[in-house]
Amino acid sequence: MDKFRVYGQSRLSGSVNISGAKNAALPILFAAILATEPVKLTNVPELKDIETTLNILRQLGVIANRDETGAVLLDASNINHFTAPYELVKTMRASIWALAPLVARFHQAQVSLPGGCSIGARPVDLHISGLEKLGADIVLEEGYVKAQVSDRLVGTRIVIEKVSVGATLSIMMAATLAKGTTVIENAAREPEIVDTADFLNKMGAKITGAGSDHITTEGVERLTGCEHSIVPDRIETGTFLIAAAISGGRVVCQNTKADTLDAVIDKLREAGAQVDVTENSITLDMLGNRPKAVNIRTAPHPGFPTDMQAQFTLLNMVAEGTSIITETIFENRFMHIPELIRMGGKAEIEGNTAVCHGVEQLSGTEVIATDLRASISLVLAGCIATGETIVDRIYHIDRGYEHIEDKLRALGAKIERFSRSDEA
């Protein structure tokens, strides 16, 4: 199992090219199941979760390959299996997105109950209830979600009980091939939903309202091929902005979209950063200063993203002052805090709230990554701490950050990957 060794007290500065968004690429890859013709996707990041998804698609009978330019080519015209097995699904919660397009196009699907990050309860209930309202018969048997429908799904009005990105995407995908009109109320509004809707519309779907809490889909009989470029990763962008903010540095994030990060940019400016934006870049300059503490409350988009909470927790641990962080989206999402405390941070956790007391300096030690975003906060902490930090279980990071050590090195970080066998 790989680890990172990080030598600290680096000021992180320079330019970084932002990858395509994992959280858009994954649903779009699964949505390609709906197409009867080949699909070409560009700006798809090279990540563990992407490779897992491609393997699931191949298991179903999709021809899925990358060409010499890195584009992903998909042909789902000859799908002949309708089961996503446990051995592939177990590592990734997003694999539940195979269910809706299979049921919508082939009227049957079996998807193993998924795995992934250990961030509290992320039930698939909302996916299931949405598909049931469209007419699917669903049972849970032997660890599998089994769905079928005798004919096409039928459009209806669906009010999602709790705002859910995953369920919004599942219902929207299924509705593209349903008879009649489907209206999703209380839909999630994330940019990745907009990107998925744009992709589906290029294939011939009739979706309006994506990006609002009211999405309308007119069902069509079939979807065709298209080309699509994945939207830039707003969470990777925010992570590199934090890297400069906590180290007194200056970073230019290229190939990104500032309008997907308004809540994050507002908080960075509140923390004392100078932030300038163009159509496809964001520049953050801390001018060598220590950040000021900022209160954070996570919320569905356009609120503050839960996937940036761990990075801002780190910022607050080295900032001037005391801050309160409230996590409203997921339970059990403060697992990075005990590790940061081991590095000299000061914080108390009570329920879904953490109170951080900024310290001037963290100290390197050995820490364990527990989930994707917690992991990257520990790596960034190592970049600014004194001495050496070892980050274990970095497979979490490989699930969501493309070429992370190369990008950090380009900004001046002293970081290397090694395995336990190297230590022997």
Curated annotation (Swiss-Prot):
The keyword Ligase does not apply. Its main location: cytoplasm. It is an enzyme of class 2 (transferase). Pathway: Cell wall biogenesis; peptidoglycan biosynthesis. The keyword Transport does not apply. Keywords: Cell cycle, Cell division, Cell shape, Cell wall biogenesis/degradation, Cytoplasm, Peptidoglycan synthesis, Pyruvate, Transferase. GO terms for biological process: cell division; cell wall organization; peptidoglycan biosynthetic process; regulation of cell shape; UDP-N-acetylgalactosamine biosynthetic process. Coiled coil: none annotated. GO terms for molecular function: UDP-N-acetylglucosamine 1-carboxyvinyltransferase activity. Phosphoenolpyruvate binds at K22, N23. It catalyses: phosphoenolpyruvate + UDP-N-acetyl-alpha-D-glucosamine = UDP-N-acetyl-3-O-(1-carboxyvinyl)-alpha-D-glucosamine + phosphate. It is found in: Cytoplasm. The modification 2-(S-cysteinyl)pyruvic acid O-phosphothioketal is found at C117. Its EC number is 2.5.1.7. The active site is at C117 (proton donor). Belongs to the EPSP synthase family. MurA subfamily. HAMAP family: MurA. Cell wall formation. Adds enolpyruvyl to UDP-N-acetylglucosamine. This is UDP-N-acetylglucosamine 1-carboxyvinyltransferase. It comes from Haemophilus influenzae (strain 86-028NP).
